[in-house]
Amino acid sequence: MNIFLVIHELINQADQVNVTLTNHVGAYIGAGMAMTAAAGVGVGQGFASGLCATALARNPELLPKIQLFWIVGSAIAESSAIYGLIIAFILIFVAR
């Protein structure tokens, strides 16, 4: 009778360890997926900056208008990267 209680306790402990390990792995995978936002933002921002530089080379007199849209667009793009970073930090440090 006691051996069954010991086996039951061992199974419960092993099950708790696997759940904890699964939670950590899931949190790290989720954090990595959230940080792919930064890669996408970098590509998009580089593309937009290149087009702004091309527009300024063609029409230098439009500097104030292009610069305004360039800065606002960069700020909007960076906000999504910052949100991805915050989500990654929450998953890594809070979801334990």
Curated annotation (Swiss-Prot):
Oligomeric and partner information: F-type ATPases have 2 components, F(1) - the catalytic core - and F(0) - the membrane proton channel. F(1) has five subunits: alpha(3), beta(3), gamma(1), delta(1), epsilon(1). F(0) has three main subunits: a(1), b(2) and c(10-14). The alpha and beta chains form an alternating ring which encloses part of the gamma chain. F(1) is attached to F(0) by a central stalk formed by the gamma and epsilon chains, while a peripheral stalk is formed by the delta and b chains.
Localization (cell): Cell membrane
Chief subcellular location: membrane
Protein name per UniProt: ATP synthase subunit c
Transmembrane spans: 24-44, 75-95
GO CC, one annotated term: plasma membrane
InterPro entries: ATP_synth_F0_csu, ATP_synth_F0_csu_DDCD_BS, ATPase_proteolipid_c-like_dom, F/V-ATP_Csub_sf
Annotated site, Reversibly protonated during proton transport, chain positions: E78
An example Gene Ontology molecular-function term: lipid binding
Coiled coil (residue ranges): none
Role, per record: F(1)F(0) ATP synthase produces ATP from ADP in the presence of a proton or sodium gradient. F-type ATPases consist of two structural domains, F(1) containing the extramembraneous catalytic core and F(0) containing the membrane proton channel, linked together by a central stalk and a peripheral stalk. During catalysis, ATP synthesis in the catalytic domain of F(1) is coupled via a rotary mechanism of the central stalk subunits to proton translocation. Key component of the F(0) channel; it plays a direct role in translocation across the membrane. A homomeric c-ring of between 10-14 subunits forms the central stalk rotor element with the F(1) delta and epsilon subunits.
Gene3D superfamilies cross-referenced by the UniProt entry: lithium bound rotor ring of v- atpase
UniProt keyword list: ATP synthesis, Cell membrane, CF(0), Hydrogen ion transport, Ion transport, Lipid-binding, Membrane, Transmembrane, Transmembrane helix, Transport
Family statement: Belongs to the ATPase C chain family.
Source species of the chain: Mycoplasmoides gallisepticum (strain R(low / passage 15 / clone 2)) (Mycoplasma gallisepticum)
Pfam families recorded: ATP-synt_C
Top-rank lineage group of the source organism: Bacteria
PROSITE patterns tied to this protein: ATPASE_C (PS00605)
Membrane topology summary: Multi-pass membrane protein
Note: Dicyclohexylcarbodiimide (DCDD) binding to the active glutamate residue inhibits ATPase in vitro.
